[in-house]
């Protein structure tokens, strides 16, 4: 059985990206799913001065979780066209453990937003950048207008079908 680590790149308690990552991860057959909450990995703002004091345990814990996965299912929040500050900070700290902080793990990469572009800018940025950080991108998916297409925890049929097709193409 495949082990999936899923998370949304946001610390929002009602993160739509965490909802999408959780939904997608549970569509993968024969897999156990562990959903991470970025709030469990609170870190001081990265600086080389703080790094001299040592890498915080939360960064090591997150890095270890990534290493335990057979597949990463990640959906990124878009803040002003980029990653959320909390997620970027987590990447910065874990990159000090290993610059390939995604440890060459297969990653299904997604983004969603309340708007029509569905996090397209952050998805493009991550799809370009994450392979340099050791992510083996196996597929991408963008969901526009989250609140119009995810109703009571279920994607509308056309988007559900697209997501299933994207996930199936990974196999």
Each predicted region: which residue ranges?
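Short, glycine-/small-residue-rich phosphate/pyrophosphate-handling segment
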Residues: 103-144
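Short, intrinsically disordered, mixed-charge
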Residues: 92-99, 128-132
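Short, histidine-centered active-site or binding-site loop motifs used for metal coordination
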Residues: 8, 111, 147
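Glycine-rich NAD(P)-binding loop of Rossmann-like domains
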Residues: 102-104, 152-155
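N-terminal beta1-alpha1-beta2 submodule of the flavodoxin-like/Rossmannoid cofactor-binding fold
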Residues: 1-92, 96-97, 153-169
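Mobile beta-alpha loop/short-helix "lid" or hinge segments that flank ligand
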Residues: 34-44, 132-150
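A short small-residue
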Residues: 2-3, 106, 144-151
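Short alpha-helical linear motifs
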Residues: 43, 109, 128-130, 148, ...
């Amino acid at each position: 059985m495949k082990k999936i680590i899923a998370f949304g790149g946001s610390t929002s308690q009602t993160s739509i990206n965490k909802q999408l990552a959780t939904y997608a991860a549970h569509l993968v057959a024969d897999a156990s799913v562990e959903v991470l909450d970025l709030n469990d990995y609170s870190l001081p703002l990265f600086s080389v001065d703080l790094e001299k004091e040592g890498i915080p345990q939360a960064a090591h814990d997150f890095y270890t979780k990534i290493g335990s996965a057979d597949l990463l299912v990640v959906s990124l929040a878009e803040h002003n066209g980029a990653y959320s500050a909390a997620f970027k900070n987590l990447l910065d700290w874990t990159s000090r453990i290993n610059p390939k902080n995604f440890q060459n793990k297969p990653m299904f990469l997604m983004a969603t937003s309340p708007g029509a572009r569905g996090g397209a800018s952050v998805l493009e940025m991550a799809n370009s950048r994450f392979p340099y950080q050791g992510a083996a991108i196996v597929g991408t998916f963008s969901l526009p207008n989250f609140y119009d297409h995810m109703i009571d925890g279920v994607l509308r049929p056309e988007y559900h079908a697209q997501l299933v097709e994207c996930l199936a193409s990974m196999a």
